[in-house]
Amino acid sequence: MKWSKLIRGINVVAFSCMALAVLLPEIVEARLRVVATTTIIADTVQQIGHDKVTVRSLMGSNPHHYKIRTEDIRHLSQAHLVIYNGLSIENGLRRVLSQLPKDVYIVDVSDCLPKKNLRSSHQFDDHHSHPENSCGYHYDPHFWLNVNHWMVVVRQIEKSLKVIDSNQAHFYHMSSNKYLGQLNELDQYIRSQSEKIPTNLRFLVTSHNALGYFGQAYGFETDGLMGTEGEETSIANLRRLSYKIMDQKLTTIFWDNTTSRKSMQALQESILAKGHKVSLAGPILVGGVLDSRQTLQNCDKHNHSTYDGMMRHNVDTILVHLTPSRDDGN
């Protein structure tokens, strides 16, 4: 009798598994196929769409080094929705995007931001040269580093999902509202952490000069070894930055996850050789969220595979290294 019940139970489980195996492809197929160029856009789509979407990110955590692959073109062509940054990051993709099938809905999220809110790349690195974007302007593409700008983008992504999937409009709206509440808390967190740093110490020197929007929003002056487009630096710029760091009496510089740490080590060594003590800290996450399989040394409590966690990690890293210790007598 016991054996009979056991066998019946096994059969039920087996049948259930077979049914699930048959239904699963249909469930996955029913989801919106969304391709996002950056990991930050992909994370935001996932936060709004949840199980209604299947999201693929193309560029990884360092979009400046991205090179398009054949499989990327296939995913783009098969997508219901393609969302991209729009400001120079995807220069290598523009031709491909223009040739996608007409039934692929394509969204440039930078279009939702007033041009007056976009930073000219020259405002932060006049000493670098820049390739022009398709409009002939030189906009800094790292607007996600100002949380208030990214909250505008959240609404744009919500609208885009509703255009493609109007039956789930209420779901996307409620998810968007919830996520915006989380981002409002994030913005307040960054402000409160930044205010703990003395005003005269709020100077961020990074390997890639990507923190212009962050600095404007949260009260920091910024500079970098490489420009906003991630182009290589020059000996002249390394010398300029060395003397600026010494003149400002800065004691910490930062490396970020889009460039090799070696470039900032070279800057640090140049400054140390001149008799000025400066430490190297990081990484600051500027290019995108990390893959869930990636880890950071001295990992903090934040989830670096989300936009929220990335931004919290950044401000906490800055706070730790720019706040005077008690040993300094401050």
Where are the language model's segments positioned?
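Extracytoplasmic metal-acquisition and chelation regions
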Residues: 24-330
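N-terminal secretory signal peptides that target proteins for export/translocation
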Residues: 1-6
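Bacterial N-terminal signal peptides
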Residues: 10-23
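Residues marking helix boundaries in flexible regions
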Residues: 8-11, 28
